[in-house]
Design a protein with these regions (language model features):
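Catalytic cores of enzymes
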Residues: 1-242
Length: 242
């Protein structure tokens, strides 16, 4: 006999989740380039994400996920556990039904986790997935996965995707070019569609302005300083003439 059930009531799978070194290195590198913030390992908690994620241009989540085919609202992203919380086994899970009630306003949400875009039909709602939840919560576009993706290959593609976005490419073209570049250098079985075709873009495809904007008052302050310097120089010249 073979018994299959969703691991909602039992969270022992958390102990078997593999580290994601390629995703960690990626987020550290590009958070510096784009002047962002990152949280990894024990700092990547569910509560911190909910408090920090709103109103950013890009939200990037590199973690494990579970798609629940029986109850799609119970599909979840898995964050770091709180060591001190021994009673609430589920405190590190962010479920689809919770995401619908969170402000996740952003130009782009990147969900490099297994099956975040895998949909399940629910009467009256259509196709439900974690990506659908992020879109409802305010993310204008979502880069997501349709199946269990290889962490190393997806990190390479997302890196190329970021590079293309920084060049001003539309998001769909940035992803297409990233996949083509990946295929050109992939060797052996890693060139198979299983390793690169699972990442798809949903939603708005417009480019993202990733250049840091300087507030207007910085220009005003610089102008005032320049004016003061000019006045001081004029005053010095008058003093020398007298």
């Amino acid at each position: 006999q073979l018994g299959i059930k969703d691991s909602v009531k039992l969270d022992k799978t958390y102990l078997t989740l593999l580290p994601q070194p390629f995703s960690e290195e990626l987020v550290k590198q590009y958070s510096k380039i784009f002047n962002g913030r990152y949280f990894v390992n024990e700092n990547a908690s569910k509560d911190l994400f909910i408090n920090q994620a709103k109103e950013h241009k890009i939200i990037h989540i590199g973690t494990h996920a579970e798609s629940n085919n029986l109850s799609p609202e119970l599909s979840r992203l898995i964050f770091a556990k709180k060591v001190e919380d021994k009673e609430n086994y589920d405190e590190n899970s962010l479920y689809s039904y919770e995401i619908y009630n969170i402000d996740l306003s952003s130009n782009l949400a990147i969900l490099t986790a297994c099956e975040t875009g895998k949909p399940t039909y629910q009467a009256g709602e259509g196709m439900i997935s974690l990506a659908h939840a992020f879109n409802y919560a305010g993310s204008e576009s979502i880069l997501t996965s349709l199946w269990e993706i290889d962490e190393e290959s997806s990190a390479k593609i997302v890196k190329l995707f970021y590079d293309n976005l920084s060049k001003g490419m539309p998001k769909d073209e940035a992803l297409r070019q990233a996949k083509l570049s990946y295929i050109e250098t992939a060797e052996g079985r890693t060139a198979a569609p299983q390793y690169w075709a699972g990442l798809v873009l949903i939603g708005d495809t417009a480019p993202i302005d990733l250049k840091a904007r300087v507030a207007w008052w910085w220009y005003l302050a610089a102008g005032i300083v320049a004016l003061i310097l000019v006045l001081l120089l004029i005053g010095n010249k008058k003093g020398e003439t007298n």
